[in-house]
Amino acid sequence: YALVCNGGVLLIDGKEDLEWYEESKKIIKESSNELLKAIDILNKDERRRLEVWFIKELFVFTKCDYPEEVVYELESRINTELVDIFNSGVKVYIVPKKLSKGNAVERFRKYIKARKVIVAGDSELDISMFGIADVAIAPRKLDTKCQLPIKTIVLPERKVYSEEVLE
């Protein structure tokens, strides 16, 4: 199994589970107008450095100069009760609140009837799933940025994070 697109798409043996995807679209339906509004705003923004991507009609992504300013402007024009707007470096994301990684992990736990869930994440985008999991794995850099749940295994940064997790 692999959850991609912020948990909106489930791959089983490399193939997309269409029922999972359709359910994801239903879950975020109330956010659709805000996503479309963000696309319109970003398409007109001169700070944008990449076309605006509407990834699987689930969330919006682009790259911008001065991304913090872009996020601030979007937050003033879009309903932030329905969507999260943030940047990671020059990347700008608009993601329905209901399409969090934490919600995806909870859906997946029920889907496979898992008794125990272990997650690994390396950015602030991953924090919502840490509280859902029985065990979470994160790099030290994330532990210094925000408060992680007590059950989080914090890895030293000696190697590439994915290699540390697999060991």
What are these regions (language model features)?
Residues 38, 42, 70-81:
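Short amphipathic alpha-helices in soluble, non-transmembrane regions
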Residues 1-47:
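Active-site phosphate-binding/coordination module
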Residues 49-55, 84-87:
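Short beta-strand
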